[in-house]
Regions:
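Catalytic alpha/beta core domains of metabolic enzymes, predominantly
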Residues: 130-137, 141-201
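Active-site beta->alpha loop and helix N-cap motifs at the rims of alpha/beta catalytic domains
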Residues: 1-150
Length: 201
């Protein structure tokens, strides 16, 4: 995850680029693949307007024309909604998919998270109809926000078998959900990559 640095109240683009160059150099040194994640929680996705969100992607492409990246998207303008509306994700989705060589991380939202498992599955599937880039689903546990719930095994399986979802990210502090995900994907031979930070560790 790339931290969007600020200086005097504005994004510090030189430090942003330097951070990614340092990460890439470290990955190259150790012989591992590193794909930067932009505009997620460390990128202040919930605080960026659409113009600044797009500018982060533009600045990355100016400095790294061929680098694969992952960008988080969330529901825009949903704070007063009483029902889940998949189209709230469309604005940021379109900004990401204007770029090549990227993946879209569909970050959870209160409206999506509070649905029962079957309707939650349907909500993700609705968003997937607009995907032209590979999709990654995202879950939180309630240690982060009180309304969050990790995926039940049935829901994880339903998302993992969707052809447009290549993986899933779970953010955990209290439970080893990432290990549950990895075990299910391995045992069922699912073509779906579990992702996690080191939150639980």
């Amino acid at each position: 995850a790339v931290l969007l640095p600020f200086l005097d109240g504005q994004p510090d683009w030189a430090s942003f680029v330097a951070e990614i160059r340092w990460q890439q150099a470290a990955a190259d040194h150790y012989g591992v693949e590193l794909v930067p994640v932009l505009n997620a929680d460390t990128g202040y996705i919930f605080d960026l307007d659409d113009r600044m969100y797009a500018e982060v992607l533009r600045q990355l492409r100016l400095a790294f024309p061929d680098l694969r990246f992952i960008a988080g998207i969330t529901a825009r303008g949903a704070q007063d909604d009483t029902t889940f509306k998949a189209e709230r994700y469309r604005a940021l989705l379109d900004l990401v998919q204007a770029h090549d060589n990227c993946e879209v991380m569909i970050m959870t939202s209160k409206g999506l998270n509070t649905l029962d498992p079957e309707r939650r599955r349907d909500g993700y599937y609705q968003i997937a109809e607009w995907l032209i880039r590979p999709g990654i689903v995202h879950a939180l546990e309630p240690a982060f926000v009180p309304w969050a719930t990790p995926y039940e095994p049935w829901l994880l399986h339903q998302l993992a078998i969707h052809p447009k979802f290549v993986g899933g990210k779970v953010s955990t502090l209290d439970e080893p959900h990432f290990l549950y995900w990895a075990a299910m994907c391995k045992d069922l031979k699912l073509d779906f990559a579990p992702h996690s930070g080191d939150d639980y560790g």
